[in-house]
Design a protein with these regions (language model features):
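Accessory cap/linker subdomain of secreted extracellular hydrolases
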Residues: 151-181
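N-terminal cap/lid segment of alpha/beta-hydrolase-fold proteins
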Residues: 13-39
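Alpha/beta-hydrolase active-site loop
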Residues: 95-118
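Short beta-strand element of the alpha/beta-hydrolase
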Residues: 43-51
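Short glycine-enriched nucleophile-adjacent loop
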Residues: 134-144
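The serine-hydrolase catalytic nucleophile loop
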Residues: 51-63, 77
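Alpha/beta-hydrolase fold nucleophile elbow
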Residues: 120-131
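Conserved alpha/beta-hydrolase
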Residues: 65-89
Length: 181
């Protein structure tokens, strides 16, 4: 299904009128920490899914969405910030883009969706993310039927194997971008 909320058509509200709730939820035995932004009249709900970097919850993006009547859960990636677990880094050659890691991160996103669903069962729920989330979000959406839509920014257009080959090829080559752009 397709769901679109034109932000310019919504009545933006001040951040002061948005309720926030710190949450922790479990995924595969690990406790993940985040915050839910709850506008007065939410039209939809989203979970923000991380890219590959070691980044905590995305507060500014969550605030922007919530000011436009979207309920948002943003959480610290596993092993980052207040979340437990082990972070698998984006360095070349790590298991960051392995099938096991991407499925694990998809389970984390799915657990976040289940947490939002408990907050408000009547809203359409989606996932929004950047970069590596372009692999994670479709996996989660395929396995969790509560997910009704996906928004992907700067998402990968190649397989993880092709991405890994590219990383190995360009790693340490300071002249790569000068010669190939």
């Amino acid at each position: 299904s397709f769901f679109l909320i034109p932000i310019n058509q919504l009545n933006a509200q001040s951040l002061d009128s948005i309720k926030t709730e710190n949450v922790t939820f479990k995924s595969e035995g690990v406790s993940l920490a985040g915050i839910i932004y709850i506008p007065k009249k939410p039209q939809a709900a989203v979970v923000i899914v991380h890219g590959s970097d070691q980044v905590p919850r995305m507060i500014k993006f969550a605030e922007l969405l919530s000011k436009n009547n979207i309920l948002v859960l943003t959480y610290d990636k596993r092993g980052v910030g207040e979340s437990d677990g082990v972070y698998a880094g984006p360095e070349v050659g790590t298991n960051n883009i392995s099938r096991d890691n991407l499925n694990l991160l998809a389970k984390d996103a799915s657990a976040a969706v289940n947490t939002i669903h408990k907050e408000n069962k009547n809203l359409p729920i989606g996932l929004v993310g950047f970069s590596q989330a372009g692999w994670i979000i479709p996996i989660a959406a395929n396995k969790n039927k509560l997910i009704e839509f996906m928004v992907l920014f700067s998402a990968p257009t190649v397989t993880t194997l092709e991405q890994l080959r590219f990383q190995f090829y360009t790693d340490g080559r300071t002249d790569f971008w000068e010669n190939h752009t």
